[in-house]
Amino acid sequence: MNNNFEKSILLMVPQWIQYHVSHRNETTFYVYPEYLKPFLYFLRDHMSTQYKVCIDITAADYPSRASRFECVYNLLSVEYNSRIRIKTCVDEITTLESVTPVYSSAAWWEREVWDMFGVFFHNHPDLRRILTDYGFQGHPLRKDFPLSGYVEVRYDDSEKRVCIESVEYSQEFRYFDFESPWEQVDKNSLLK
């Protein structure tokens, strides 16, 4: 993507963009969460952009940041044979406006981000789990989710039914912190 394109976008909507990064012909715009939807409308409808296809929406979890979830929107302009990445950051409480009115395919991607990370999309037409079970607790791609999960789901052949049991840990003398595995454990508390 050329430098003139980036400059023209920055001149047209400077208040919506936090900053942008260009690396190896890939452009990423970081936008404020409240301006995400208008910015995507702009990129879709403006004659010089024509990003009519939402290829993917995903997220990444950075627990050390105040706005720990980075939502990533990958867009394609068939008209100009160009791709662009839009990122916005939110915390656990802040909701994002659903972009399903802008891109209908976003409905599926937003459901996946909700299911895996717990990022809530306001005004989504059908925000429910898509990859995990209906009774599933938590969001498995968060960094504070335990690797083994909270329950074990298995089929018991002798009882001919699905059994849900609490996870049993086979290792002895190991400290499992269910509160926040990303905090440092005090060495003295392990010796007790």
UniProtKB/Swiss-Prot annotation:
EC number: 7.1.1.2
Listed GO MF terms: NADH dehydrogenase (ubiquinone) activity
Disulfide bonds: none
Keywords, in A-Z order: Electron transport, Membrane, Mitochondrion, Mitochondrion inner membrane, NAD, Oxidoreductase, Respiratory chain, Translocase, Transport, Ubiquinone
Keyword Translocase: yes
InterPro entries according to UniProt: NADH_DH_suC (IPR010218), NADH_quin_OxRdtase_su_C/D-like (IPR037232), NADH_UbQ_OxRdtase_30kDa_su (IPR001268), NADH_UbQ_OxRdtase_CS (IPR020396)
Organism domain of life: Eukaryota
This protein's GO CC annotations: mitochondrial inner membrane
Broad enzyme group: translocase
Catalytic activity annotation: a ubiquinone + NADH + 5 H(+)(in) = a ubiquinol + NAD(+) + 4 H(+)(out)
Subcellular location(s) per record: Mitochondrion inner membrane
Pfam families tied to this protein: Complex1_30kDa (PF00329)
Family annotation (Gene3D superfamilies): NADH:ubiquinone oxidoreductase, 30kDa subunit
Similarity remark: Belongs to the complex I 30 kDa subunit family.
Summary of the function given for this chain in its UniProt record: Core subunit of the mitochondrial membrane respiratory chain NADH dehydrogenase (Complex I) that is believed to belong to the minimal assembly required for catalysis. Complex I functions in the transfer of electrons from NADH to the respiratory chain. The immediate electron acceptor for the enzyme is believed to be ubiquinone.
Subunit organization: Complex I is composed of about 30 different subunits.
Protein name, entry field: NADH-ubiquinone oxidoreductase subunit 9
UniProt lineage: Eukaryota, Viridiplantae, Chlorophyta, core chlorophytes, Trebouxiophyceae
